[in-house]
């Protein structure tokens, strides 16, 4: 959405820290960035979702995909040029300036490499953080614990032993 183009001081827009603040600034609008994590929201920003049947029937393929994804993040952060060329090929509207901003923000905030990832590996998911996220959603009455059990919402089996360290 281009809500920022209206320059309404009461407008809000949800977005990615690596993208929307850059676009808003490029549009000449001064904006404040508020992080959900700063407000106590413990959930992971991005996870890999997969159907239960796929995990059961094609677990090796899922494991390979997860591993390649984590290694891809490590490679991208070490040398973004090859991936950026592919991004620009598929999205001709993408600029070098936007990509540089995104990589800088990823690194500055430790979005893929900070927190538990620094010692446990990129893409790590912990039981403690999954429980904190679940409890937050239960407390906010967004999940009914009688209908949704924590143990059925995630698995660490594909990431716990990967240790793709930054």
Feature map (PLM): residue ranges:
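Conserved C-terminal helix/tail region of periplasmic/extracytoplasmic solute-binding proteins
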Residues: 128-166
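A bilobed periplasmic-binding-protein/Venus flytrap-type ligand-binding module shared by bacterial periplasmic
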Residues: 45-61
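Active-site-proximal glycine-rich helix-loop-beta segment
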Residues: 8-10
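Short beta-strand->loop
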Residues: 30-43
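A ligand-binding cleft/hinge motif common to bilobed small-molecule-binding domains
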Residues: 12-30, 110
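Secondary-structure end/capping motifs
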Residues: 57-140
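Short, small-residue-biased leader/transition segments that mark boundaries at the very start
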Residues: 2-4
């Amino acid at each position: 959405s281009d809500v920022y183009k209206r320059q309404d001081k009461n407008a809000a827009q949800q977005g990615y820290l690596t993208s929307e603040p850059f676009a808003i600034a490029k549009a000449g609008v001064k904006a404040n960035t508020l992080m959900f994590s700063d407000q106590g929201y413990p959930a992971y920003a991005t996870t890999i979702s997969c159907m239960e049947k796929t995990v059961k029937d094609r677990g090796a393929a899922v494991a390979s995909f997860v591993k390649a994804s984590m290694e891809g993040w490590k490679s991208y952060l070490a040398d973004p040029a090859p991936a950026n060329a592919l991004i620009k090929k598929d999205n001709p509207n993408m600029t070098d300036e936007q990509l540089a901003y995104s990589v800088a923000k990823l690194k500055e905030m430790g979005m893929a490499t900070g927190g538990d990832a620094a010692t446990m590996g990129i893409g790590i998911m912990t039981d403690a953080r999954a429980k904190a996220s679940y409890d937050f959603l239960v407390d906010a009455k967004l999940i009914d614990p009688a209908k949704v059990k924590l143990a059925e919402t995630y698995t660490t089996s594909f990431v716990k032993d990967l240790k793709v360290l930054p």
